[in-house]
Amino acid sequence: MSKQTFTTTFAGKPLVVEVGQVAKQANGATVVRYGDSTVLTAAVMSKKMATGDFFPLQVNYEEKMYAAGKFPGGFMKREGRPSTDATLTARLIDRPIRPMFAEGFRNEVQVINTVLSYDENASAPVAAMFGSSLALSISDIPFNGPIAGVQVGYIDGEFIINPDKEQMEASLLELTVAGSKEAINMVESGAKELSEDIMLEALLKGHQAIQELIAFQEQIVAVVGKEKAEVELLQVDADLQADIVAKYNAQLQKAVQVEEKKAREAATEAVKEMVKAEYEERYAEDENLATIMRDVAEILEQMEHAEVRRLITEDKIRPDGRKIDEIRPLDAVVDFLPKVHGSGLFTRGQTQALSVLTLAPMGETQIIDGLAPEYKKRFLHHYNFPQYSVGETGRYGAAGRREIGHGALGERALEQVLPSLEEFPYAIRLVAEVLESNGSSSQASICAGTLALMAGGVPIKAPVAGIAMGLISDGTNYTVLTDIQGLEDHFGDMDFKVAGTREGITALQMDIKIAGITPQILEEALAQAKKARFEILDVIEATIAEPRPELAPTAPKIDTIKIDVDKIKVVIGKGGETIDKIIAETGVKIDIDDEGNVSIYSSDQAAIDRTKEIIAGLVREAKVGEVYHAKVIRIEKFGAFVNLFDKTDALVHISEIAWTRTANVSDVLEVGEDVDVKVIKIDEKGRVDASMKALIPRPPKPEKKEEKHD
């Protein structure tokens, strides 16, 4: 295929698609140019079905530093593992694409997005999502798209599609919404306590904008799209399925309705193992035993899936016996740990998260050096999910994509209520340790984070709580579930996480397993989530009503002083010599910003006070008219040099020592003597003249005697 170019304008920026010039051996490839951002997307598919019980889709988002005209950091000067932003963007693209493949599709698919040039005012992630859908759509890979995504901002009551950098900084909303022509199928958002009505309108505005991008893709597919390949889907033997269902469905139904998680898992597993043992023995001599046993496992999974969904939609019975809109039992605890700067333990049913707060000087902020201009990140929220939380063994190591994603969601939810840097000049880190999990652990980490922040004395604007909503739909009828547990998440159609305060929403995240959901479902889910959020906030506020007025004794204390910008170099000294000396003497940590704000951190208030005294002395300037208690440091014929304070000296001219004539300075003063002086002049070079006699009343002039004349 020769190169073909397709052009349109979207959200005020040129959108150009090139097909047929590069990566021609991939099943499908596109170059998408949005503004000055350029993304190459290549989609490939394996020729055979993969083993395993899941669809092996891999989406990568690769940031090449040359795209922004930068050298990679580090010793190797080469791109390494994906950044957190790259990982989150890959997840953002994966989530709306995954539901668009057929049930039973098991061929491995890889979608690789490479950022070739970067424009901070034209979203490369949005371009990559567009390119991913288009590369799959024009390929022979059986993808049931297209999909597209946009960013939505909210400024002065107006919604903005794909806002630029300046607009996004001013926006009360940072929303990414994706979907098909028919419905929304992915949401990711942070918001500054916006109402459910505004959030719903933003979602609908985003979906409306998506239609334009989908229509553009359809035009391109009509010209260059390939015929879709015929691939084998995972299908079970119908006779085998009928046999197993007839014999064992009643037993599995009974096991599924055991309310307690571990007991239910044991009961269902016992039924499954019994069935597998019977059919393994029956077909032991069959050459297709492996395929038969794979089908048996798949049939049992489908039976459990169908029963859980039937109970909810028809009987309105949940696996643990709760009502459709009922939250599991809640518990909130603060000060779970000694010594740390703050801690909170939040439990919702069999899901439990411990959040631990650490405060540090601003020098500990994380420096983010990616494609965007380098910046410092003050607030970090890390999420850990050990395997023991679900009673299993497993891999331990660096955080995976899921842990990074859940940590970022909690970070967005909580950062909206943090105090400003001026109010609270600390770097803040929260670590969420999931101790038990039966669904919604990311939302438990948000609730635990709120407890830890308030217990640690961080003056947040309001408590934040999170809840996960679910959906069971047969295409005609649906049921929205409040506070989904693991089984409902696994067999359900939606995981819709909503976090916020009593005033409004601070974060949203939605993943679905069906092609999309309607505005009616979204509205109902948001309304149920608000009710549940308020119930959780009641429990949090009953435990700790507001942030404590004082930090923990172990937290670093802080004091801030302001110095003139031109005095920064005086405090730092040559090569950092002066500031290092201060730190060595007092044991504090010192941060100085470009505006002359000096922050001093220590657990010892006396050390802070001493540091302030030293710095004040370094930056202090003599002022005309002020009086100083000085020390004579050198005597010359023409006067005496005195030290006013620290490194500031002044000259007391011989004529300024006394009102009467001074013949010799050394007759009046000696080195080391303390004297009071008044500054009378500072010249343009900063040289200071002082006077002793200015502090002494001037003696009256002697009266002239009248001469007598005879």
Curated annotation (Swiss-Prot):
Recorded catalytic activity of this chain's protein? RNA(n+1) + phosphate = RNA(n) + a ribonucleoside 5'-diphosphate
The broad enzyme category this protein falls into is: transferase
> Keyword set for this entry?
Cytoplasm, Magnesium, Metal-binding, Nucleotidyltransferase, RNA-binding, Transferase
Q: What is this protein called?
A: Polyribonucleotide nucleotidyltransferase
Region feature (Disordered): 691-710
Specify the domain of life of the species encoding this protein. Answer: Bacteria
The enzyme's E.C. designation: 2.7.7.8
Q: Which cofactor does it need?
A: Mg(2+)
Stretches assigned to coiled coil? none
Record gene name: pnp
The beginning of the lineage is:
Bacteria, Bacillati, Bacillota, Bacilli, Lactobacillales
Biological process GO annotation list? mRNA catabolic process; RNA processing
Example of a GO MF term:
RNA binding
